[in-house]
A protein has these predicted regions:
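Short, well-structured alpha-helical segments
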Residues: 91-95, 197-204
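Gly/Gly-Pro-rich "capping" loops immediately C-terminal to redox-active cysteine motifs
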Residues: 18-70, 148-188
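Amphipathic alpha-helical interaction surfaces
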Residues: 34-40, 77, 100, 104, ...
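Cationic, amphipathic, low-complexity alpha-helical segments enriched
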Residues: 1-8, 172-181, 186, 191-202
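Post-cleavage N-terminal segment of exported redox proteins
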Residues: 1-16, 56-129
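A glycine-rich, coil/turn loop motif that links secondary-structure elements
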Residues: 23-24, 84-88, 194-195
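Sequence/structural segment immediately N-terminal to covalent heme-attachment motifs in c-type
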Residues: 1-38, 122-158
Length: 206
């Protein structure tokens, strides 16, 4: 039971990053907006899938990054903020949580359910008019007509998809494949009508 306490505390950093990593977040997003079910859910960029893949070379930085450096990049780009220093409470919390979920997984392996599913190229070229209609019919209910999400009692309950309170140029979501794969996993229920965020999906718990 005692071993779970650090992981539970770290869970709060993933779910409410702006509060528990204050000073390093420059927008309204939390880690769990992209890493669903607080980083647990398979095929939704789970943290347990990423942890065992590092150290790894990243073209964005032009060097081999360790997991700490990868998390720092998330704060700089996806959170549009600043990188917490190595050994800071925020990074140690995220590293502890990721390690706890990935414990026992083979290091260096591409685990089933890591990352996002591959999305095939669309049969038609991108079209703003079609996209506007799809957004109005499928996305605006949660994210708003302007894509800026929704806040309740001062807390962001649905994330902004673009703009000053969202990610910047360096985030993975600037590539069309990442938000498409994420939205398919995040926003759609399965055939049984079960929300994907209700399913277990960690290396330890799946």
């Amino acid at each position: 039971m005692g071993a779970l306490l650090p992981a539970r505390a770290s869970h709060r950093t993933v779910s409410d990053t702006g509060t528990h990593a204050a000073g390093f977040v420059g927008n309204s997003l939390s880690c769990s907006n992209c890493h669903l079910d607080a980083g647990r859910l398979a095929n939704s960029a789970p943290l347990w899938g990423a942890y065992v893949r590092y150290p790894a070379y990243r073209a964005k930085t032009g060097k081999v990054n360790n997991y700490t450096e990868r998390l720092q990049g998330c704060f700089m780009y996806s959170m549009d903020g600043t990188a917490p220093p190595a050994g800071s409470e925020a990074l140690v919390a995220l590293e502890t949580y990721s390690y706890w979920m990935a414990e026992g997984a083979p290091v260096g392996a591409q685990l089933p359910g890591a990352g996002y599913p591959e999305i095939p190229a669309p049969p038609l070229p991108p079209d703003f008019a079609r996209g506007e209609a799809v957004f109005a019919d499928n996305c605006a209910l949660c994210h708003g007509d302007d894509g800026q999400g929704q806040r309740v009692a001062g807390r962001q309950v649905f994330p902004p998809l673009w703009g000053p309170q969202s990610y910047n140029w360096g985030a993975a979501c600037t590539s069309w494949t990442t938000p498409l794969a994420s939205s398919r996993r995040t926003c759609h229920s399965d055939a049984a009508g079960v929300s994907p965020t209700s399913r277990p999906g960690t290396w330890r718990c799946s």
